[in-house]
């Protein structure tokens, strides 16, 4: 075999080795990409499922806390979270973890376990009420449509998640976020429907509920009926156009 043939054979072998190496690298990159896409896809699906729950959440406060041991101190984070559907259901939760996202996730889970219904009339509460927790006191009063939520940050978070759009509030005593939020929850849990109060007292509804509340409820019922009729008419028009 001549020197030229030997060189050509060596070049051919090197070319084959290079092609094989590049092919293996591409295969490994493809497998890594598939694994990465799988993980990202799973996370994306979880986010979409969480978004599908249609729940609002507000992180009221995040505190850094520490626990002293014999060998030193361990630091962690505590998150106070409010969760609600924006339509009369709300809950408050408290979560602790060494990482902030984990603490918030635990707070959301705890809030979902303690959700309750809030009586409302056209976006406001049914009657004045006062809630307490430790040294904190929160006063809630009904408000006319368009008033808005007159409240501080802690109380506002609870009102927004509960779907209350018009309310007057006053916070007294302790200004600690945990006490204020828990006092607000205590006040909301004391709210009652006018029918419940009338049944308990053995009186007629108009003898218990003020005229303004009855007018607001009647207006709310009329608005809801009108919205349903408009939605039904729009749906019928779409079906007719489709035919």
UniProtKB/Swiss-Prot annotation:
- Record flagged with keyword Repeat: no
What Pfam families does the record point to?
Ribosomal_S5 (PF00333), Ribosomal_S5_C (PF03719)
Segments for region (Disordered)? 1-50
S5 DRBM domain spans which residues? 55-118
Q: Which domain of life is it from?
A: Bacteria
Q: Which UniProt keywords apply?
A: Ribonucleoprotein, Ribosomal protein, RNA-binding, rRNA-binding
Gene Ontology terms describing biological process: translation
Record's function text: With S4 and S12 plays an important role in translational accuracy. Located at the back of the 30S subunit body where it stabilizes the conformation of the head with respect to the body.
Q: What is known of its domains?
A: The N-terminal domain interacts with the head of the 30S subunit; the C-terminal domain interacts with the body and contacts protein S4. The interaction surface between S4 and S5 is involved in control of translational fidelity.
Family of the protein in this entry: Belongs to the universal ribosomal protein uS5 family.
User: Which NCBIfam families does its entry note?
Assistant: rpsE_bact (TIGR01021)
User: Which protein is depicted?
Assistant: Small ribosomal subunit protein uS5
The organism encoding this protein is Bifidobacterium longum (strain DJO10A)
Q: Which gene encodes it?
A: rpsE
